Amino acid sequence: MADSKLAQQHGVLVLNKPKGPTSAHCIARIKRLGQKKIGHAGTLDPMAQGVLLVLLGQCTKISGYLMEGGEKIYSGTLELGRTTDTWDDEGETLSTADWTHVTEEDVVRAVDLWTGSSEQQVPAYSAAKHKGQPLYKLAREGKETPVKTRRIEISQAETLAVELPFVRFRVHCSSGTYIRSLAHSLGNRLGCGAVLTELIREYSHPFSLDEAHDLDDVLAEPAELAGRVIPLDKALPHWPKLRLSAADEARVKNGMPHPYDPAEMASMPFTEGIRAVLLDPAGDPLALAETAYRNQVPVWTVLRGLWNT
């Protein structure tokens, strides 16, 4: 039941999304716990489970910075010998094929070939947009979906187990990688087709499944929500934190850059593009900032103000 008395939280709730519901459905249920300002970073398909970053309060403002350059780790299972319209187990079967010519060595080589940079085809049933419309809506309406690709990076791919026609694997990949597409391409390479049957997101930069809370627990124990939320100032663990004086806080709120003090950043010599979280005198997040030159003077410029409640 919704608890309107719960205070709005400001931070990241690392959720262990269960298999079945959409990411949006999970968010809607948590919203009923008095969390009117809520969002998420990195959608998971309904058939997938694992790390879903739920952004609460002021943390909804940092989604782009939280995800920037962040790696994801997935483990999953694919099945050889069939194809579906969605490239996973949830879709309508389009074809079946004999897979018995495929050996374990063939599978291991094919998984190894995922590693590196490539242009990946985006599934027709996806949230990627064409002229403002999600591709999945066009596909469901029977309309032609344009072939879209995106640049991805797989830093590591490994075969965990082979029990043909099933293959378990793990990949370390860039944000935006479609694991369904990897399964589909592997099936094409082996000449028998393949679909994704299971997917677990084990890591979404900078949080892992070990830090995640089950949705049922979050909903059953609303009074524990605050203790489960990672505060905003800790949501960007690799960003330096700088506490400002009251006078400097006022200047930042008025849109003025904050002077760069080399003594505050002794371990990191000045270069343009260093990012930090500016804190107010009480230690609460005030703004995200980045180093730059203004009139040849090194300063911190505000990327995103966090002081509005």
UniProtKB/Swiss-Prot annotation:
BP terms from Gene Ontology: mRNA pseudouridine synthesis; tRNA pseudouridine synthesis
EC number: 5.4.99.25
Source organism per UniProt: Oleidesulfovibrio alaskensis (strain ATCC BAA-1058 / DSM 17464 / G20) (Desulfovibrio alaskensis)
Catalytic residues of the enzyme: 45
Keyword Transmembrane helix tagged: no
GO MF terms held by the record: RNA binding; tRNA pseudouridine(55) synthase activity
Function: Responsible for synthesis of pseudouridine from uracil-55 in the psi GC loop of transfer RNAs.
Family: Belongs to the pseudouridine synthase TruB family. Type 1 subfamily.
Top-rank lineage group of the source organism: Bacteria
PANTHER family: PSEUDOURIDYLATE SYNTHASE TRUB1 (PTHR13767:SF2), TRNA-PSEUDOURIDINE SYNTHASE (PTHR13767)
Protein name: tRNA pseudouridine synthase B
Matching InterPro entries: PsdUridine_synth_cat_dom_sf, PsdUridine_synth_N, tRNA_psdUridine_synth_TruB, TruB_C
Matching CDD domains: PseudoU_synth_EcTruB
Pfam families for this protein: TruB_C_2, TruB_N
UniProt xrefs under HAMAP family: TruB_bact (MF_01080)
Keyword line: Isomerase, tRNA processing
Catalytic activity field: uridine(55) in tRNA = pseudouridine(55) in tRNA
